[in-house]
């Protein structure tokens, strides 16, 4: 029969192994969550931004962004805000032109409206116009990939991307 000291050591080893296994499971789950695509209804993807980009619209959106978004996404949208390290998955880098060119305004509006852990929903906190204003602001953080040089390269078959042949 094991002594109390042996039982205690065995119990500690089992608890340590269990804790280690749990940490591994959480990390694997979180890694898969990071790359999980947003499921956005098709009709929402097709929505066009009804808000006109004016100086006052962008100024208002900038104020909302600084109050509600910059803590995680960073002042310039790089996903490097002071609270970014506390979240897993990390906040999106809104300056990533490739990523931003893959999503429609409707998708960005949906993401702001609905949220997804750890990002909160802003549907009840902000009006539709405020959320559409944020879409305009978020779009301004990245440079569109479609430039005259890219259009010309695609036209002559030198660029590869969606809709181009390899």
Segment roles from a protein language model:
Residues 5-23:
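N-terminal Sec-pathway targeting helices
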Residues 25, 110-111, 123-157:
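C-terminal capping alpha-helices of c-type cytochrome domains
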Residues 90-106, 121-131:
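Electron-transfer interface patches adjacent to heme c in soluble/periplasmic c-type cytochromes
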Residues 67, 89-91, 114-117, 129:
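Extracytoplasmic
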Residues 73-79, 98, 113, 123, ...:
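Detector for the c-type heme attachment site
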Residues 37-64, 148-149, 156-157, 161, ...:
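Electrostatic cytochrome c docking/interface patches
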Residues 55-78, 84, 108-114, 134, ...:
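Sequence/structural segment immediately N-terminal to covalent heme-attachment motifs in c-type
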Residues 27-57, 70-95:
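His/Cys-centered metal/cofactor-coordination and adjacent catalytic loops
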């Amino acid at each position: 029969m094991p002594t109390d000291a042996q039982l205690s050591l065995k119990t500690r080893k089992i608890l340590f192994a269990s804790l280690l296994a749990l940490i591994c499971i959480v990390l694997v789950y979180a890694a898969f969550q990071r790359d999980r695509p947003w499921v956005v209804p098709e009709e929402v993807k097709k929505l066009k931004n009804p808000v006109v980009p004016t100086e006052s619209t962008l100024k208002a959106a900038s104020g909302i962004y600084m109050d509600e978004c910059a803590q995680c996404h960073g002042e310039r949208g790089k996903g490097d805000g002071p609270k970014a390290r506390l979240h897993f998955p990390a906040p999106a880098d809104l300056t990533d032109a490739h990523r931003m060119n893959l999503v429609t305004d409707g998708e960005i509006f949906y993401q702001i409206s609905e949220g997804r852990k750890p990002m909160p929903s802003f549907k009840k906190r902000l009006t539709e116009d405020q959320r559409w204003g944020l879409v305009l602001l978020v779009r301004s953080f990245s440079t569109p990939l479609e430039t005259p040089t890219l259009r010309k390269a695609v036209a002559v078959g030198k660029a590869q991307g969606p809709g181009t042949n390899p």
